[in-house]
């Protein structure tokens, strides 16, 4: 089963562009993934490919399996069947920044990679997210948006092939979210990881994604390439896929 369905609304990708995409290395490949909790099937024979440099967003109702899929890709949840193939362990940024309060910002950035990255690498990563000169500061002195910037720096400091984002902007105010969207797009363009962003926000998906997936009942129900649509045309289609009235 391929999850990238050719939906009637989606125009075909030009052959030359498709060939370039197909030559890009895979950040992750998933085949036949299944996860059960008792008798309930949360992920049902799911297939998924994400290529390096591709930004994929995953929409769906609560309980459809989005976070379970992300946790499986991150190695935090063991699937019951199927294969997950990735060149290396991915990086994950969660809704909560999960910074250690007793560690400085640079120590948080290199957590688990102290000997291979060190302070110099942390300083560079913090500068990339607009926190230059704050290496020796403490998490308690940061705003919510600044803390998520540190979490992003930690996620990208080792240049992962795959970056997993689990609603990292959901708790931020509207203006900070907009700023974070711009920062994430800039960082992804610079580092070229494959990205899977789990979100409930259709507008966030339209702003960030190269490809938007809609998950329903443990399966990928629809796939769209935003470049083939105007946001005004695609937004009501996505809302309809999610079972939301777009009036």
UniProtKB/Swiss-Prot annotation:
Keyword Transport: yes
Residues that hold ATP according to the record: 60-67
Catalysed reactions listed for this entry: ATP + H2O + aliphatic sulfonate-[sulfonate-binding protein]Side 1 = ADP + phosphate + aliphatic sulfonateSide 2 + [sulfonate-binding protein]Side 1
Gene Ontology molecular functions: ATP binding; ATP hydrolysis activity
UniProt KW keywords: ATP-binding, Cell inner membrane, Cell membrane, Membrane, Nucleotide-binding, Translocase, Transport
UniProt membrane topology term: Peripheral membrane protein
Compartment(s) of residence: Cell inner membrane
Gene Ontology, cellular component aspect: plasma membrane
Keyword RNA-binding attached: no
Domain ABC transporter: 28-242
A Pfam family assignment: ABC_tran
EC number: 7.6.2.14
InterPro entries assigned: AAA+_ATPase, ABC_transporter-like_ATP-bd, ABC_transporter-like_CS, ABC_transporter_ATP-bind, P-loop_NTPase
Known function: Part of the ABC transporter complex SsuABC involved in aliphatic sulfonates import. Responsible for energy coupling to the transport system.
Family the entry assigns: Belongs to the ABC transporter superfamily. Aliphatic sulfonates importer (TC 3.A.1.17.2) family.
Assembly mode: The complex is composed of two ATP-binding proteins (SsuB), two transmembrane proteins (SsuC) and a solute-binding protein (SsuA).
Protein name as catalogued: Aliphatic sulfonates import ATP-binding protein SsuB 2
The species this protein was found in: Paraburkholderia xenovorans (strain LB400)
Gene encoding the protein: ssuB2
């Amino acid at each position: 089963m391929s999850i990238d369905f050719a939906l009637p609304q989606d125009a075909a990708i030009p052959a030359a562009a498709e060939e370039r995409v197909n030559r890009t290395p895979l950040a992750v490949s998933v085949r036949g993934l299944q996860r059960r909790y008792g008798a309930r099937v949360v992920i049902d024979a799911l297939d998924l490919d994400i290529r390096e440099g591709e930004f994929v967003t995953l929409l769906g109702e609560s309980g459809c399996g989005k976070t379970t899929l992300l946790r499986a890709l991150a190695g935090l949840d063991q699937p019951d069947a199927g294969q997950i193939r990735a060149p290396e362990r991915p990086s994950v940024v969660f809704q909560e920044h999960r910074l250690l309060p007793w560690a400085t910002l640079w120590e948080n950035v290199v957590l688990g990679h102290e000997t291979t990255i060190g302070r110099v690498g942390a300083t560079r990563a913090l500068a990339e997210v607009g926190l230059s000169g704050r290496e020796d500061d403490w998490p308690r002195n940061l705003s919510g948006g600044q803390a998520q910037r540190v979490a992003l720096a930690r996620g990208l400091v080792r240049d992962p092939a795959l970056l997993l984002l689990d609603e990292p902007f959901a708790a931020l105010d509207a203006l900070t979210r907009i700023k974070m969207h711009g920062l994430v797009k800039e960082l992804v363009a610079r580092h070229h990881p494959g990205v899977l962003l789990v979100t409930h926000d259709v507008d966030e998906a339209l702003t960030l994604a190269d490809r938007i997936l809609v998950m329903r009942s443990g399966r990928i129900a629809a796939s769209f390439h935003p470049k083939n649509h105007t946001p005004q045309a695609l937004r009501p289609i996505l809302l309809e896929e999610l079972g939301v009235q777009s009036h």
